[in-house]
């Protein structure tokens, strides 16, 4: 927290990581969204958001979950085209879950 009592993007990101580790995907999604609202270029927070949008394996995501994850993947790749992990994740979401290929 900063001097005014507001949490930083990094604090929200760390809370999101903790929530994801605990299996609380909704809280992870909310915390990572707060982090990216404060810092839209926080690519690791966007990565946590991608993971939080998707159910744990082997459960397939719903169309809404896959679309939310893909939207975040696109933001990451736009900011850092070298993120091969996100190119692969996006391709799998499009082909396997959204039936776009």
Describe the function of each predicted region.
Residues 1-11:
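TPR-adjacent "capping" and linker segments in tetratricopeptide-repeat scaffold/adaptor proteins
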Residues 22-31, 57-75, 97-101:
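Structural signature of tandem alpha-helical TPR/SEL1-like repeats
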Residues 34-55:
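Short, charge-rich amphipathic alpha-helical segments embedded
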